[in-house]
């Protein structure tokens, strides 16, 4: 974020949804907030009480009449003086209000995520809470919302702060042994106890990282790929799952040349289903590209649905891939004698078997995600720093032939890596990346 250090500026932005709307909310934060009130409203409302006022330009023209709320520092979202103006959500009204605010000295439009970045800078939240808020805003399913809310509630911060304090305490014991080994009030040797404590902490962090894999699936979604020969009914199945006509259905083989993807919400879990080009030998350059893309997507899938027309000659061939594969017999309404080959039999013409397949997909997704714990790493950034923490802990535990000073330094580095997750230690270079994920006005 450019010039983020200029906290002397007062920032403003539309923080509500797309215009036009019933109500539009403009948020303001910074040292000029009271001046904005004096200029636009000719009054400063009572803190944290809604006031109905007329908003005016500097020459006195009325812009709109609406509610406003004033949140004095430090008891506000950003920790600065903040205000909200609730206007009618017409495009002209909002544009005029933003233009008037932009003309005031010391005021400028906020950059993406700048309100939240100021909240972080003023100690109102840590980085994990900020990331949780970003995920909460982006959440599209109930499962994603619950996961984001766990993070935004501070569960991660509590856990990482506890682990960091344990490392600091362990290091203090080692340094006490180094500095006061000759003193009578220092236990003879605490090293063995410290290494046992660090070993237990290492196992806790490893378990925590493992739980993060399921959280990543919930945050990013599961991927299901539909494959099969041309005219096996792949596009018809995709249209059923999507609840609308996404793919073109034709008797002509090879109609689908590229990947078609729809997003489903199965029990609160995001599931991306991809229709692919029919797998067959072909001389068509375009169709070959589509088949190559299909195979590439299969390699990334969590589940592959391999479809074959039950009414024709049976020639079930499943390509070797790591993902779980279900054999699906299609066009069940036309008959077929090899029913024992298929995990499910479906007909998009009659609807036979489709609900059972959908239920099975939801059960698969729920089993894959499992039970998400209260505090889990939700970003690759978290996992990388947790692995770095483990690496330093292992060096400290296994460094029997090293001086205690060096092992204490490993413990200091481990606690520093944990501090970088929450933003307590040396994170300036990643702030732009994190806060750029927010929309303007948040």
Curated annotation (Swiss-Prot):
Subcellular localization(s) per the UniProt record: Cytoplasm
Primary location recorded for the protein, binned into one broad class: cytoplasm
GO annotation, biological process: tRNA methylation; tRNA wobble uridine modification
Residues in TrmE-type G domain copies: 221-366
Stored CDD domains: trmE (cd04164), TrmE_N (cd14858)
UniProt binding sites for (6S)-5-formyl-5,6,7,8-tetrahydrofolate: 27, 84, 124, 442
GO cellular component, one term: cytoplasm
SUPFAM superfamilies: P-loop containing nucleoside triphosphate hydrolases, TrmE connector domain
Protein function: Exhibits a very high intrinsic GTPase hydrolysis rate. Involved in the addition of a carboxymethylaminomethyl (cmnm) group at the wobble position (U34) of certain tRNAs, forming tRNA-cmnm(5)s(2)U34.
Family per record: Belongs to the TRAFAC class TrmE-Era-EngA-EngB-Septin-like GTPase superfamily. TrmE GTPase family.
Protein name: tRNA modification GTPase MnmE
The encoding gene: mnmE
